[in-house]
């Protein structure tokens, strides 16, 4: 489920954009647990899209619990910054922030990108760190590890099913994808998810959409 699962347009302006979110949009999902249980009943598994870059802000359902886990005061309402190089933050990121949603029925995570390519440690890319730890965390309790992530460059297929990122709605974009996908197999990248039909810009074209679905199948 893409960003619609969490609050986007209604995030108070003092907190910035709605890209990052960890609280269900109850206007669209009034009973998340029942919704996820019904998907499971139908034999489906659910992944939620996350853009972790803005950390945990005071409007989030888990803000107080994350603040307490980090020994901070929730009353000040200060944002808890995303920091993939901070062990304590990453522990709270998984054990509090994500575990609450997994306990409701979320099966795995769709890690998206807003974090940039740099962290406090030179040469450490946040998306690589997220891929590594999401993969390991998903394998706890002897489960088969599973994570779904935006492409982080050659070699990143060590961990996730790859999401190739935003694609333009055009014939040129569709023409590129088969070659791109086939060439990826040359370096062992065998699991891909593309935006079938395109994601942005371009034009609406029913023939294009049909051919894109045909390619995806």
Question: What is the meaning of each model-derived region?
Answer:
Residues 1-217:
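Catalytic-domain carbohydrate-binding cleft regions of carbohydrate-active enzymes
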């Amino acid at each position: 489920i893409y960003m619609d699962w969490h609050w986007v347009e209604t995030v108070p302006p003092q907190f910035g954009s709605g890209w990052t979110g960890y609280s269900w949009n109850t206007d669209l999902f009034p009973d998340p647990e029942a919704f996820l249980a019904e998907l499971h009943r139908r034999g489906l598994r659910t992944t939620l899209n996350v853009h972790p870059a803005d950390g945990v802000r005071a409007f989030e359902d888990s803000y107080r619990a994350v603040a307490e886990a980090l020994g901070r005061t929730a009353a000040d309402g200060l944002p808890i910054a995303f920091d993939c190089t901070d062990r304590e933050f990453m522990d709270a990121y998984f054990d509090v922030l994500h575990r609450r949603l997994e306990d409701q029925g979320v099966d795995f995570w769709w890690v998206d990108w807003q974090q940039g390519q740099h962290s406090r440690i030179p040469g450490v890319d946040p998306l690589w760190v997220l891929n590594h730890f999401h993969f390991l965390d998903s394998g706890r309790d002897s489960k088969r590890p599973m994570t779904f992530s935006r492409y982080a460059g050659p070699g990143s297929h060590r961990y996730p099913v790859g999401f190739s990122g935003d694609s333009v709605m055009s014939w040129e974009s569709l023409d590129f994808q088969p070659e791109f996908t086939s060439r990826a197999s040359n370096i062992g990248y065998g699991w891909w998810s593309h935006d079938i039909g395109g994601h942005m810009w371009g034009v609406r074209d029913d023939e294009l959409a049909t051919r894109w679905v045909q390619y995806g199948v």
